[in-house]
Amino acid sequence: MNRLQRQLTLLALMLLGLFAAGSARALCITGVCACTTVTTNVAFGSYSPLAFGNTDSTGSVKVSCGGVAGLLIPFSIGFSTGSSGSYATRQMKNGSYTLNYNLYTDASYTTIWGDGTGVSQMVGGGVTLDVLGLAPAQTFWVYGRLPGRQLTAVPGVYADTINLTLTYY
């Protein structure tokens, strides 16, 4: 099992299945395939603590894999809790001040993206090993929500760092 860790920074201003899956798994374990991610930040922009509505934003995670044959590689994507240590409520920080937010797997903001523990779920999929550079990367959208009426916020830049773990077999 291989793991690739990338960082996704949050700023307040974050089929060619020619062989069986078992063959693909064996190739990845022996180092014949490699998967990568490209991320875009979830940037919330300006925030007014007096506003009643939520501030929403999106980012993305693109997954692509390369190797010796057009095998389908299953994978999962997990996110860390960030500085809050909790999936229930993540927090961006500006010194000792915080803003609550969270990251979701869906546009209805119902499923928290995490590592599969507690209230969180991972996202999974499969991508074809790209031998010739022709297979498109698989894109997953990250939905960020910053709740309104966080009256303790002070002006400044709030940020959090989320570790992304891509596990492929």
Model-derived regions: residue spans:
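Predominantly extracellular/luminal cell-surface or secreted proteins
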Residues: 78-82, 102-106, 114-116
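N-terminal small/polar-rich segments of proteins
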Residues: 25-96, 129-169
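Extended, solvent-exposed segments with strong compositional bias
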Residues: 110-133
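Bacterial N-terminal signal peptides that target proteins for export
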Residues: 1-11
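N-terminal signal peptide c-region/cleavage motif recognized by signal peptidases
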Residues: 21-23
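Acidic Ser/Thr/Pro-rich low-complexity disordered segments
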Residues: 27-31, 109-114
